[in-house]
Amino acid sequence: MMVTLVLKYVLVIVMTLILRVLYDSICCYFLTPRRIKKFMERQGITGPKPRLLTGNIIDISKMLSHSASNDCSSIHHNIVPRLLPHYVSWSKQYGKRFIMWNGTEPRLCLTETEMIKELLTKHNPVTGKSWLQQQGTKGFIGRGLLMANGEAWHHQRHMAAPAFTRDRLKGYAKHMVECTKMMAERLRKEVGEEVEIGEEMRRLTADIISRTEFGSSCDKGKELFSLLTVLQRLCAQATRHLCFPGSRFLPSKYNREIKSLKTEVERLLMEIIDSRKDSVEIGRSSSYGDDLLGLLLNQMDSNKNNLNVQMIMDECKTFFFTGHETTSLLLTWTLMLLAHNPTWQDNVRDEVRQVCGQDGVPSVEQLSSLTSLNKVINESLRLYPPATLLPRMAFEDIKLGDLIIPKGLSIWIPVLAIHHSNELWGEDANEFNPERFTTRSFASSRHFMPFAAGPRNCIGQTFAMMEAKIILAMLVSKFSFAISENYRHAPIVVLTIKPKYGVQLVLKPLDL
């Protein structure tokens, strides 16, 4: 009798849980999207008709396959139709504001800069990353700062901020100079030969972030870089299937490989962490070090910020990805632009030698005087921003300009389209013209957002800009760059904007 009663209770609990999951799934995949769609239609905002479960993903995929199927016929920068063909098509059909569907997740496209400013500043506390975004990167960078929301984001931002103080940045500069010198010496041996500069920049920035994040464990940091590069690609591919309920639990090829690589990445991180902890425990070292990992371990040891090992690993993965990926691409595209615009290359070289001397090694204090270089970097970030879009989800109903944004609606800010807008930048918006950052003072405007904007802007942007200036100043003073005849201009998007075939340059060492 008692056994029967227990079984009945268990059955009731199980059925209740099943019904709860079923109800939540129906709300998530059908009722909430339908409610948001009707709510926005009443405000006059429509968009392409979504398919069941997949939304507009198939349509976007077809457009991207067509637009990026061929290389560019020449080196030009009118890349919005190539990388955002769906934006170009639907903005013409539905206007500046339209709703598109990433599976069952509705996304409002927004390009009006005043509203974007309001969203990223005033409404920052009640917006953030969506569930789909978090799931798409969970296997890659976990719950680090990049994907955190609300109190978790504030907590992690506060935790990471000491790593980017002015004094710490000065300390990082020596690693940047040292690593660049070693690379330059190696490149000097390849006189007149073609160099895939993108691969060189990936190695260089991975070396720098390994030293600044892991210090004496930088060799393992380089191994970690290789694993994270593969893991990033797999997660980007697996994200396409997240619109299907339960897809992340299926034993698919992508899911198995992601799980295996994630385990290997975290094993390697644990080795680095355990090595630091052992050194302190046996008295070989008096602290965990002054790099990012040491800073986090010191906070955990002193019971600050409620840190645990998993949080430290997620932050390490996050900063490793953001700390080398975006900067290596910035350097790659900037060197391509300088090689394609020799007059600006000469201007920057003359400025570097005048400010920094013949060896071209800048001090941190001299970087602000490299105005031509700064303009070139900003123009590179405008034409080829690290990411094509900036997403935010509303966690409660908000008033944005003349719109009411309902809870659960994601807002999709097409950064690339804004950076290339003739309306905002003039008729030469698709041309390389660094002078625009002098005459029009756009560097600090709401039209320019390579590192996002508002309280949630990129915490490492000062680090990235310092690194880019040091590396470019040293390289341009030691080499001249020319585009190789083998270079094929074909930008693509794999989370970030990348050159499909790399960037082949011919380097010529300069006699000093």
UniProtKB/Swiss-Prot annotation:
The chain crosses the membrane at residues 2-22. GO terms for molecular function: heme binding; iron ion binding; monooxygenase activity; oxidoreductase activity, acting on paired donors, with incorporation or reduction of molecular oxygen. Specifically expressed in roots. Its cofactor is heme. It holds the Pfam family p450. Gene3D superfamilies: Cytochrome P450. Keywords: Heme, Iron, Membrane, Metal-binding, Monooxygenase, NADP, Oxidoreductase, Transmembrane, Transmembrane helix. One of its GO terms (biological process) is trans-zeatin biosynthetic process. Cytokinin hydroxylase that catalyzes the biosynthesis of trans-zeatin via the isopentenyladenine riboside 5'-monophosphate (iPRMP)-dependent pathway. Can use isopentenyladenosine-5'-monophosphate, isopentenyladenosine-5'-diphosphate and isopentenyladenosine-5'-triphosphate as substrate. Belongs to the cytochrome P450 family. This is Cytokinin hydroxylase. It comes from Arabidopsis thaliana.
